[in-house]
Amino acid sequence: MASPKETLQRRAARVRRQVKAVANGRPRLSVHRSSKNIYAQIIDDVRGVTLAAASTLDGDLKGKLKTGADSAAAAAVGKLVAERAVKAGVKDVVFDRGAFIYHGRVKALAEAAREGGLSF
């Protein structure tokens, strides 16, 4: 039987493989969630560069949020990363949730990014 860590790694690899299959050169919106914060970045895998990034640790958000570990904070990060991506000229992305299920904070970030101007 696989350990929990191995299960997460397999799920992340499976999702990443699916994302790359449908990407067609589009950058990906990668999400990482920890117990206290949430991070998002737009990555261009073709060139190997990060085009935009945001997290609950950003100076723009840190003082405004009650905590970095709730859906409101995730929505603020989604809106901020979308704003920065549009400023960088990126509107079409592929959503990469990693090993995290599309629920709660990950879903709040994705919906806020869509409202902010990203399409996926």
UniProtKB/Swiss-Prot annotation:
SUPFAM superfamilies: Translational machinery components (SSF53137). The keyword Nuclease does not apply. Pfam families: Ribosomal_L18p. GO terms for molecular function: 5S rRNA binding; structural constituent of ribosome. It comes from the Bacteria. Coiled coil: none annotated. One of its GO terms (cellular component) is cytosolic large ribosomal subunit. Keywords: Ribonucleoprotein, Ribosomal protein, RNA-binding, rRNA-binding. GO terms for biological process: translation. Part of the 50S ribosomal subunit; part of the 5S rRNA/L5/L18/L25 subcomplex. Contacts the 5S and 23S rRNAs. Belongs to the universal ribosomal protein uL18 family. This is Large ribosomal subunit protein uL18. It comes from Brucella canis (strain ATCC 23365 / NCTC 10854 / RM-666).
